[in-house]
Swiss-Prot record:
Species of provenance: Arabidopsis thaliana (Mouse-ear cress)
TM region(s), chain numbering: 367-387
Alphabetized UniProt keyword annotations: Activator, DNA-binding, Endoplasmic reticulum, Glycoprotein, Golgi apparatus, Membrane, Nucleus, Stress response, Transcription, Transcription regulation, Transmembrane, Transmembrane helix
Protein name, entry field: bZIP transcription factor 17
Recorded name of the encoding gene: BZIP17
Keyword Transmembrane: yes
């Protein structure tokens, strides 16, 4: 067994005055036991060198063994190959820690009892306090190692670890190792260390320079590659542009050559024409200057065929021969005469003058036509009020105070078919289109034209067409439009009421009461001496025509009332003891009329042709809800003995005349005079009425509105019993 290393520590050595190391500090005062008991810190270095076998002289280092060193390549891992001869392995050459150096990993053979030989661990620089790292498990080791005073770094721990690995069962067993160091091995180790340091520096520099060169070469190659590519692209562009320019020049030259050829051909053609014209001119001059004998005229050559130009002149030409160019072109040297420019200004002026003349003519025609149109309008407007378009008559605006039967004839012809039929018994109403009227009052014109009403009466329609109408009622001196469907509904109701009384219709027909058109009064035919008074009624203004006939002749009204009173056939206007004004033959005036228009969706009235029959003293029991409401049953108009067709009836045949169908539709009250409602069946209430409006349906196709004037309150009136 070897001696244990645990023993008393020797006292710290005295500081060496020749030593270069600084004086030990408090930490350095702690003594560290050496790995080998044969060496101590107090032993001088000279003795150690002598023990190692080195001479006392200078120590020399040689680098003869540099070739035997192994340097790994860049791609190889830093592994030291194992030498089979001495069973040693060189460690990694990479620095690991502060005490980096060439550290050898001790390989422990399988045979644990044998002596373990390890390579020496030599550090570059190791402080003195690094021996603390080897303390601990190294107290049980006896490793005689040279240069133990320099510290062993981590070698002690490595060896101990290897030893412990080889013998894990006995950790506290001290391992005796005898390291045999030879002089040659020591020298080789030191030389190898220095060579390795130098080689590492050289290798680093070479690597850096190599990397530098490789980077520079790569950059230079990249730059040169880009420049070459640019040069190639530039060359390609230049070649393409040069080729395109050559092609353009070639095409341009070809076009110019083609133009030159065309010009030469044109010049040749023109030269031929000029020579032909000049020859013809010379021939004509010769003929004029000679005896007047004209040679036979040669026909002109066809188009495109001109006589060739001869180099020698014509015998009759006074001018010298042509000078031909040497190039072969037949262009003469004589100047070609230019054509005189046309007078464009004169033509433009002529065109302008023509356009101005045409415009003036157009304006004249337009003005004349416009004047003619104005004249026609003026003529038509002046004659329109005179001519009665509806009935083909002429109004008496230009007749003045002529005492002629023609006015009477015009009245009869103008107001025919406008007779309101009233029965004396009040049974019904109707309109007869009687054309048997007096054509004159002269004794010379004794023949009278009698036409039965049945021949000229208008037959009612079959009721297949829808009828739509509108009613205009005067209100506040204005005409207010009222829907005609209300009137048509009233007509239907009235026709139903009349149809129920058809069996008791009266067969007697009395004279008709004529109502003049265009607001003219329906007066009896006056004597010849009263034509002026009739003309006064005919030529009144429109406002006067819409008023009552009270402004007319008072004597006429009195005579008519007396006649009606004498006849005793007037009917009552209101019932229950209230005396009302009665109608007379001169109290109704036509206000307006309108035809029923046929449109889809309207009410279709019945097509029955019946006459209304209404008994005497008929009372309307319905109350008036509005001043314009339609009455339930038609109100008959009283008959009259004085009739325009009375004389005609005496001279006519005895057969019965059937008038056309007519019906009183409604009776309206003037809103300015009527009250708001009925008072005991009275239309106007306690306020007296001056006029009423009566709407009559003629032949189920035309509505006529009459304005009937009631006598004044002071006028005489009768009440039938």
């Amino acid at each position: 067994m070897a001696e244990p290393i645990t023993k008393e520590q020797p006292p710290p050595p005295a500081p060496d005055p020749n030593s270069t190391y600084p004086p030990p500090s408090d930490f350095d005062s702690i003594s560290i036991p050496p790995l080998d008991d044969h060496f101590s810190d107090q032993t001088p270095i000279g003795e150690l060198m002598s023990d190692l076998g080195f001479p006392d002289g200078e120590f020399e280092l040689t680098f003869d063994g540099m070739d035997d060193l192994y340097f790994p390549a860049e791609n190889e891992s830093f592994l030291i190959p194992i030498n089979t001869s001495n069973q040693e392995q060189f460690g990694d050459f990479t620095p690991e820690s502060e005490s980096s150096g060439i550290s050898g990993d001790c390989i422990v053979p399988k045979d644990a009892d044998k002596t373990i030989t390890t390579s020496g661990c030599i550090n570059r620089e190791s402080p003195r306090d690094s021996d603390d790292r080897c303390s601990g498990a190294d107290h049980n080791l006896d490793l005689p190692t040279p240069l133990s005073s320099q510290g062993s770094g981590n070698c002690g721990s490595d060896v101990s670890e290897a030893t412990n690995e080889s013998s894990p069962k006995s950790r506290n067993v001290a391992v005796d190792q005898k390291v045999k160091v030879e002089e040659a091995a020591t020298t080789t180790t030191s030389i190898t260390k220095r060579k390795k340091e130098i080689d590492e520096d050289l290798t680093d520099e070479s690597r850096n320079s190599k990397y530098r060169r490789s980077g520079e070469d790569a950059d230079a190659s990249a730059v040169t590659g880009e420049e070459d590519e640019k040069k190639r692209a530039r060359l390609m562009r230049n070649r393409e542009s040069a080729q395109l320019s050559r092609q353009r020049k070639k095409h341009y030259v070809e076009e110019l050559e083609e133009k030159v050829r065309n010009m030469h051909s044109t010049i040749t053609d023109l030269n031929g024409k000029i020579s032909y014209f000049m020859a013809e001119n010379a021939t004509l001059r010769q003929q004029l200057g000679g005896n007047g004998m004209c040679p036979p005229h040669l026909p002109p050559p066809p188009m495109g065929m001109y006589p060739p130009m001869a180099p020698m002149p014509y015998p009759w030409m006074p001018c010298p021969p042509y000078m031909v160019k040497q190039q072969g072109s037949q262009v003469p040297l004589i100047p070609i005469p230019r054509l005189k420019p046309q007078n464009t200004l004169g033509t433009s002026k002529a065109k302008k003058s023509e356009s101005k003349k045409s415009e003036a003519k157009t304006k004249k025609v337009a003005s004349i036509s416009f004047l003619g149109l104005l004249f026609c309008l003026f003529l038509f407007g002046a004659l329109a009020p005179i001519v009665n378009v509806n009935y083909g008559g002429i109004s008496g605006a230009f007749y003045g105070n002529y005492r002629s039967n023609y006015i009477t004839d015009q009245i009869y012809s103008q107001h025919r078919d406008r007779v309101l039929d009233t029965s004396r018994s009040g049974a019904g109403t109707g309109v007869s289109n009687s054309n048997g009227m007096h054509r004159g009052r002269d004794s010379d014109r004794g023949a009278r034209k009698n036409i039965s009403a049945t021949e000229s009466s208008v037959t009612p329609g079959n009721g297949s067409e829808p009828l739509v109408a509108s009613l205009f009622v005067p209100r506040n001196d204005k005409l207010v439009k009222i829907d005609g469907n209300l009137i048509i509904n009233s007509i239907l109701a009235s026709e139903k009421a009349v149809a129920s009384r058809k069996a008791s219709e009266s067969k007697e027909r009395k004279a008709d009461l004529m109502i003049s058109k265009d607001y003219t009064p329906a007066l009896p035919l006056p004597d010849v001496g009263r034509t002026e008074e009739l003309a006064k009624h005919l030529y009144r203004s429109k406002a006067e025509k819409q008023k009552a006939l009270s402004s007319g002749s008072a004597d006429t009204l009195k005579d008519q009332v007396k006649t009606k009173a004498a006849n005793g056939e007037m009917q009552q206007w209101f019932r229950e003891g209230v005396a009302g004004p009665m109608f007379s033959s001169g109290m109704c005036t036509e206000v307006f009329q309108f035809d029923v228009s046929s449109t889809s969706g309207a009410i279709i009235p019945a097509a029955t042709n019946v006459s209304a029959e209404h008994g005497k003293n008929t009372t309307d029991t319905h109350k008036q809800q509005n001043r314009r409401i339609l009455r339930g049953l038609p109100i008959p108009l009283p008959g009259s003995d004085f009739n325009l067709t009375k004389e005609h009836q005496r001279n006519s045949s005895s057969k019965e005349i059937k008038p056309a169908s007519s019906m009183v539709v409604s009776v309206l009250v003037d809103p300015r005079e009527g009250g708001d409602g009925d008072i005991d069946g009275m239309i106007g209430g306690p306020k007296s009425l001056s006029r009423v409006f009566v709407v009559v349906l003629l032949d189920s196709a035309k509505y006529v509105t009459y304005s009937c004037v009631l006598p004044r309150s002071g006028a005489p009136h009768l009440v039938t019993t």
